[in-house]
């Protein structure tokens, strides 16, 4: 019997909503059975040898173009984290000599664009004006460059690293896209066509690192100048990291079962999908604890979201919100049984996380965690009031609430404490008001979510989303509203790009995690509700990332 049905405190005459979510497709016993052969000292020795060979490549490669390409390939293969010092040394040197008037760079669109993208990606402040030599006196893109497809592709990717107030590359992007699409339709170069089509679907800057690595490893095999050592390192590293992720997933799955939340019939049992979010945000194997905690947070928040969105009455939701604000188990008897289960699961898990941080870092963070949960529950309650009062907010009013109900601000505040040591007073002060490095990715998640899920959610009778609010504000068509949301996503990314090089109390690692969260949302909702409906493309991605190792030929 499900917990919500096992209580005399619930009035059986209440008519409750149902979202008819399908049950999880990932069986507990199946998850616990996951095992990898890619563990142990033999594989560690093998990968250390390969890393040594690649390190030697950094010392041997002196051609500036080859240096850039090596960094780019290592990043796309998902193994650049092994070579951070070597990459930093090369990019630091390139930044120091960036204005030296390199003739090769001025003449090569490809070299200029790749260097610009890599430097911007790694936080170096280089000007967009470096591309002016590729425009004529009328400020139009020089036509002869249209035959340079690799250069055009590199320019397209570079254009997504612009910041607020920059428009040179943005203005030429439509022109570049037009020519790249024509190339795909006409060319017989299979590898380059594959790369162009992939980029046009979603730019590299917006892609999830781990998922991109899995895709690029297969694509790289078809490249004429493929380096066998790089490929071997990437394949082995992917499988070894997958083994770590499997152990993480198994532990999170055991925790989830212990909470009993998976037995709530109205809520989504999406522990695997939440682990996919966590792995997209924090990929590297050494961050196992942080990844597991992020997945647990996501699973809790998915359930609480369903309480407010689907099952709870307005009176019950007000009681639950008050309980979270008080953060006190003594008032739990006022809650129906199913909400007691929910509250205790949140209370115990969050207090344990705070205790871990106190032990490891000497900082009592429970007040910040309590604030995060109170903020999101109050915002959930506001949306519930909109629903019960059949109220359609303006787009501005909607977004002021809905960026919080993505749960991303709450998750990222927790994540800061997981990932950071030492924790600084300056950062704590900033977290109180949700700085832009937290706020902006949350907006992207909200807009991506609405683009992917609003149609299905409206059919279930849910609140209007950003698309419908904009249509109501402006009398726009649905397609016009969708285009506007995509525009807002693009504008927000430009602001994030600037935030990541601005002076900040937050580490580069934390900033990267905040961007990764935005990236996960764009693939999770790219073709619909990848979080709520786990048996489509999400299933294939879970299979590729956590279950199926890359086949490696035995020597």
Task: List PLM regions with ranges.
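Terpene synthase/cyclase
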Residues: 1-555
């Amino acid at each position: 019997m499900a917990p919500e049905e096992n209580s005399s405190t619930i009035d059986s005459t209440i008519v409750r909503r149902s979202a008819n979510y399908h049950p999880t497709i990932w069986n507990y016993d199946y998850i616990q059975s996951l095992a990898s052969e890619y563990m142990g000292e033999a594989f560690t020795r093998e990968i250390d040898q390969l890393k040594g060979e690649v390190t030697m490549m950094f010392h041997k490669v002196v051609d500036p173009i080859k240096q850039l390409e090596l960094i780019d390939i290592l990043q796309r293969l998902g193994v650049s984290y092994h070579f951070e010092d070597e990459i930093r040394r090369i990019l630091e040197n390139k930044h120091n000599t960036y204005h030296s008037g390199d003739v090769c760079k001025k003449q090569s669109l490809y070299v200029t664009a790749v260097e610009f993208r890599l430097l911007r990606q790694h936080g170096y402040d280089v000007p967009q004006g470096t591309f002016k030599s590729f425009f004529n006196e009328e400020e139009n893109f020089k036509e002869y460059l249209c035959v340079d497809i690799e250069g055009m592709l590199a320019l397209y990717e570079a254009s997504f690293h612009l910041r607020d107030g920059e428009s040179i590359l943005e203005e030429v992007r439509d022109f570049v896209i037009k020519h790249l699409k024509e190339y795909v339709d006409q060319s017989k170069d299979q590898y380059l066509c594959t790369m162009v089509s992939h980029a046009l679907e979603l730019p590299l800057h917006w892609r999830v690192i781990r998922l991109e690595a899995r895709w690029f490893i297969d694509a790289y095999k078809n490249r004429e100048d493929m380096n066998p050592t790089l490929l071997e390192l990437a394949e082995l590293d992917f499988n070894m990291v997958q083994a770590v992720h499997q152990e993480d997933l198994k532990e999170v799955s055991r925790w989830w079962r212990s909470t009993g939340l998976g037995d709530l019939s109205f809520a989504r049992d999406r522990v695997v999908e939440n682990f996919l979010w966590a792995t997209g945000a924090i990929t590297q194997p050494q961050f196992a604890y942080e990844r597991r905690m992020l997945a647990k947070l996501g699973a809790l928040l998915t359930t609480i979201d369903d309480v407010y969105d689907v099952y709870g009455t307005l009176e019950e939701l007000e009681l639950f919100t008050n309980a979270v604000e008080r953060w006190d188990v003594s008032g739990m008897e006022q809650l129906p049984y199913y909400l007691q289960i929910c509250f205790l699961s949140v209370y115990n898990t969050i207090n344990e996380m705070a205790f871990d941080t106190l032990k490891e870092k000497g900082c009592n963070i429970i007040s910040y965690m309590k604030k995060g949960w109170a903020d999101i529950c109050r915002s959930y309650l506001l949306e519930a009031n909109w629903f019960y009062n059949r109220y359609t907010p303006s787009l501005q009013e909607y977004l002021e609430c809905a960026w919080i109900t993505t749960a991303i601000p709450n998750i990222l505040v927790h994540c800061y404490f997981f990932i950071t040591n030492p924790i600084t007073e300056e950062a704590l002060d900033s977290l109180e008001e949700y700085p832009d490095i937290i706020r902006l990715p949350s907006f992207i998640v909200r807009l991506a979510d609405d683009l992917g899920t609003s149609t299905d959610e409206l059919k279930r009778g849910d609140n209007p989303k950003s698309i419908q609010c904009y249509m109501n504000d402006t009398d726009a068509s649905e397609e016009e509203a969708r285009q506007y949301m995509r525009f807002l996503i693009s504008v927000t990314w430009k602001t994030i790009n600037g935030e990541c090089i601005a002076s900040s109390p937050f580490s580069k690692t934390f900033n990267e995690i905040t961007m990764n969260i935005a990236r996960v949302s764009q693939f999770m909702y790219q073709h619909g509700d990848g979080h709520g409906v786990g048996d489509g493309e999400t299933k294939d991605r879970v299979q590729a990332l956590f279950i199926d190792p890359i086949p490696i030929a035995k020597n």
